[in-house]
């Protein structure tokens, strides 16, 4: 079905929005956002408990409200009246709950999503398009379909008027009627929950569509592209062959470093650009407004207030709580969010590093719970991701997915379980381990000290798992689909041993 090209209207809006962003004082805007949120929630149970009526500054707020995690909110505020949260931490009744993938803990969480948050997410999606047309003056992004490779759009009723589902499903359900022809999939196909069936059907139908943009998690997009390769001619491997009018590939959710070389290969010869976003079930944080290595611009005016805690202080009783007015560049921070859905100084679980403050741009560096220190080596998620990406590039391979964990035999070592494309030889696998080892030693003094002379720990080892192994494992856990992510680190030795057994790794 032909789609009326609405890109000229988008371009007109983009000129206005970009002018506003150019004049924005992000620090002042963040303070305005906080005081607006506090004022809105003063009548709630949480607002009364924390004296919101007296909060007049960032300092007042940080004095009144401690840092909390999901479990703290769940036990003290949400669980007693779940699923009907009325004037609990946000005014009115919460109509939606986003089901978090529970990447770190493995436990599915119900994250409140208010009507205000739905609108904030819609504004963030429009900002993404604004930055695209700003970088592509000849864009015709709305001349075809925008492909959202997400979870099921079907929502589960929890109570009358209250629904739960994947964040992507909540977004798909809110697309207005006039915009639906510009999005793919929709209708029954969008509501399919079985990922394997959905992938096969989407691949076949998408080849008949004029796809202009595509969004999803990198690992699941690669699985989808494998399905396309089974349908398309053998030489039709680049994305530009499958989707000749593709302009933008939107990725987020995990570090792009291990996938960069494979996507560069897929995008070769096409007119498409890769654009990173930082969405979360708790709110949309940032969008790449420039090139791939120039950071993501923080959304300072979109219903969220951000705090930043130095990662090495997160476990302390009284950590330093920065905000945009006091944050510094080149330091690692854990992200803390206050939102228009009733989250207050909520520890998001991600870590970032600012590369600029005027305007604020950052890199997502990992998860605050995503690290490995089974032997005192204190590796961060970012260091592991970068080492794996460099090692894969060194052997000419592409990583589809991987996880790493400790093995407590002898001095102990790290074992990397990696799904490569194409398959690799024993010699390549040995070279992969050598590069991972040397990169980590260069990046982390504690790791280098433990590896010196093999005294503190043995060299890392790697096992190449069969194609589809991680997808099969996720399916067995009931977590197959674009909203879920393979955990990069399984730090618990017993849990990692069980995973190895499931993947038939000895």
Give residue ranges: language-model regions.
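Active-site glycine/GP-rich loop and adjacent strand/helix microenvironment
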Residues: 1-53, 61-65, 76, 82-83, ...
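Active-site diphosphate/adenylate-binding microenvironment
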Residues: 28, 32-97, 110, 120, ...
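Conserved helicase ATPase motor motifs in RecA-like P-loop NTPase domains
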Residues: 97-104
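A broad detector of the eukaryotic-type serine/threonine protein kinase catalytic domain
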Residues: 105-106, 369
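Short "domain-exit" segments at the C-terminal end of structured domains
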Residues: 106-116
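Short acidic-hydrophobic sequence patches enriched in Asp/Glu that either
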Residues: 117-124, 298, 380
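Conserved AMP-binding loop of ANL adenylate-forming enzymes
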Residues: 131-179, 189
């Amino acid at each position: 079905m032909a789609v009326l090209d609405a890109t000229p209207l988008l371009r007109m809006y983009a000129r206005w929005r970009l002018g506003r962003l150019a004049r924005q004082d992000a620090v002042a805007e963040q303070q305005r956002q906080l005081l607006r949120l506090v004022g809105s929630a003063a009548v709630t149970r949480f607002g009364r408990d924390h004296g919101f009526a007296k909060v007049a500054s960032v300092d007042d707020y940080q004095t009144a409200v401690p840092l909390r995690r999901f479990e703290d909110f769940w036990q003290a505020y949400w669980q007693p009246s779940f699923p009907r949260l009325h004037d609990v931490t946000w005014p009115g009744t919460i109509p939606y709950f986003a089901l978090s993938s529970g990447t770190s803990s493995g436990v599915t969480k119900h994250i409140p999503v208010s009507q205000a948050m739905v609108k904030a997410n819609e504004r963030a999606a429009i900002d993404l398009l604004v930055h695209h047309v700003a970088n592509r003056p000849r864009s015709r992004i709305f001349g075809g379909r925008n492909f959202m490779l997400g979870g099921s759009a079907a929502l589960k009723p929890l109570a009358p008027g209250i629904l739960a589902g994947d964040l992507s499903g909540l977004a798909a359900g809110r697309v207005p009627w006039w915009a639906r022809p510009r999005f793919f999939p929709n209708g029954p196909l969008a509501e399919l929950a079985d990922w394997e069936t959905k992938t096969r059907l989407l691949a076949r139908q998408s080849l008949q569509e004029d796809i202009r943009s595509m969004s999803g998690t990198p690992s699941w997009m690669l699985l989808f592209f494998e399905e396309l390769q089974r349908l398309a001619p053998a030489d039709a491997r680049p994305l530009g062959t499958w989707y000749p009018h593709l302009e933008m590939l939107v990725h987020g959710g995990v570090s792009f470093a291990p996938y960069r070389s494979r996507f560069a290969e897929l995008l070769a010869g096409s007119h498409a650009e890769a654009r990173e976003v930082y969405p979360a079930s708790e709110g949309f944080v940032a969008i790449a407004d420039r090139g791939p290595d120039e950071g993501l611009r923080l959304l300072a005016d979109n219903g969220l207030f951000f705090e930043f805690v130095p990662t090495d202080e997160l476990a302390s009783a009284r950590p330093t709580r920065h905000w945009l007015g006091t944050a510094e560049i080149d330091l690692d921070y854990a992200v803390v969010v206050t939102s228009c859905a009733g989250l207050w100084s909520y520890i998001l679980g991600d870590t970032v590093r600012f590369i600029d403050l005027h305007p604020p741009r950052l890199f997502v560096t990992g998860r605050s719970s995503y690290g490995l220190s089974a032997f005192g080596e204190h590796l961060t998620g970012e260091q592991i991701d970068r080492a794996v990406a460099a090692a894969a590039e060194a052997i000419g391979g592409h990583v589809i997915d991987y996880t790493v964990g400790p093995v407590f035999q002898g001095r102990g070592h790290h074992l990397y379980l990696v799904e490569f494309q194409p398959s690799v030889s024993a010699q390549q696998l040995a070279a992969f381990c050598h590069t991972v080892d040397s990169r980590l030693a260069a990046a982390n003094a504690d790791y280098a000290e433990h590896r010196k002379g093999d005294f503190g720990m043995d060299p890392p080892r790697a096992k190449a798992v069969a194609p589809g192994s991680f997808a099969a494992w996720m399916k067995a856990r009931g977590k197959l689909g674009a909203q879920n992510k393979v955990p990069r680190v399984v730090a618990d030795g017993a849990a990692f041993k069980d995973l190895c057994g499931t993947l038939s790794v000895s």
